[in-house]
């Protein structure tokens, strides 16, 4: 497998994990696992980490990349929304989380430059991410279905035609990281 330069990170939305407070201890566990995994990817050549701005794993990834920049100043964070005005209908607390992620990003854009119109924009977003990254890191467990399943299926189909690395961090992995 060739070296990955650009990595897309996604996973569960906060509500899918039953996380509704910023101080939930599960966030610390997830961020610690992300930090270890992302540091390993950076040390093996990843230069760009991409997220889409979804609540949960993606916005926590932005915070982790912000922390990792002290040790790895060369790493870049790209925030690629599926459509224009993404997150505008969120409550104030969630919009603040998105604003924080934007402040940490080195690049911000949207794949579709129109406000949300149809699921086709989400499909184009997924296609764009797959074609512009060498792999994906997903905090996702097939035994606990969530919205990330759609991306995972598309990534698996894509990897049948193109060299594309998919790394899953499961619930067991998260549980075991607490024990380590």
UniProtKB/Swiss-Prot annotation:
This is UPF0398 protein EF_1150. Coiled coil: none annotated. HAMAP family: UPF0398. InterPro entries: YspA. SUPFAM superfamilies: MCP/YpsA-like. It holds the Pfam family YpsA. Belongs to the UPF0398 family. It comes from the Bacteria.
């Amino acid at each position: 497998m060739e070296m990955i330069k650009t990595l897309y990170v996604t996973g569960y939305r906060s509500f899918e994990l039953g996380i509704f407070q910023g101080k939930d201890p599960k966030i610390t566990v997830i961020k610690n696992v992300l930090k270890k995994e992302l540091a390993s990817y950076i040390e093996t050549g990843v230069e760009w980490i991409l997220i889409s701005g979804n609540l949960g794993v993606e916005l926590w990834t932005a915070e982790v990349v912000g922390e990792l920049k002290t040790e790895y100043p060369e790493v870049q964070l790209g925030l690629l929304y599926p459509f224009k005005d993404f997150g505008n209908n969120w409550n104030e607390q969630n919009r603040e989380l998105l604003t924080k992620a934007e402040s940490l990003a080195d690049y911000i854009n949207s794949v579709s430059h129109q406000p949300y119109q149809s699921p086709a924009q989400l499909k184009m977003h997924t296609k764009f991410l797959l074609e512009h990254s060498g792999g994906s890191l997903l905090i996702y467990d097939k035994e606990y279905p969530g919205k990330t399943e759609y991306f995972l299926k598309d990534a698996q189909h894509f990897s049948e035609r193109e060299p594309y690395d998919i790394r899953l961090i499961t619930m067991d992995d998260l549980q075991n990281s607490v024990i380590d």
